[in-house]
């Protein structure tokens, strides 16, 4: 699957570089990833089915 990877609070990972997102996506066993610059968020392709991605609803930050 593909989508924006999220943390425990359904918050996307902000980015400024593709390199950061490639590493983040690789850590989640995705085949590729990049920084989607229109909203400055990491986007992964080829994620395992059990990997959490952004769902509708608010980000519950508490970082």
From Swiss-Prot:
Single GO MF annotation:
sodium channel inhibitor activity
Superkingdom to which the source organism belongs: Eukaryota
The record's annotation in SMART domains points to: Knot1 (SM00505)
Q: Which GO terms describe its cellular component?
A: extracellular region
Q: Which SUPFAM superfamilies match?
A: Scorpion toxin-like (SSF57095)
CDD domains referenced in this protein's UniProt entry, alphabetically: neurotoxins_LC_scorpion (cd23106)
InterPro entries noted in UniProt: LCN-type_CS_alpha_beta_dom, Scorpion_toxin-like, Scorpion_toxin-like_sf, Scorpion_toxinL, Scorpion_toxinL/defensin
Q: Which UniProt keywords apply?
A: Disulfide bond, Ion channel impairing toxin, Neurotoxin, Secreted, Toxin, Voltage-gated sodium channel impairing toxin
User: Among the record's GO biological process terms, what is one?
Assistant: defense response
Q: Which residues form the LCN-type CS-alpha/beta domain?
A: 1-60
Q: Where in the cell is it found?
A: Secreted
What is the UniProt domain comment for this protein?
Answer: Has the structural arrangement of an alpha-helix connected to antiparallel beta-sheets by disulfide bonds (CS-alpha/beta).
Task: From the Swiss-Prot or TrEMBL record, give the protein name.
Answer: Putative alpha-neurotoxin RjAa9
Name its species. Rhopalurus junceus (Caribbean blue scorpion)
């Amino acid at each position: 699957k593909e989508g924006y990877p999220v943390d425990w609070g359904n918050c996307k990972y902000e980015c400024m570089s593709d390199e950061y997102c490639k590493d983040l996506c690789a850590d989640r066993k995705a085949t590729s990833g990049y920084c989607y610059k229109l909203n400055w968020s990491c986007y992964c392709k080829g994620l395992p089915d059990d990997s959490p991605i952004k769902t509708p609803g608010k980000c519950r930050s508490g970082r």
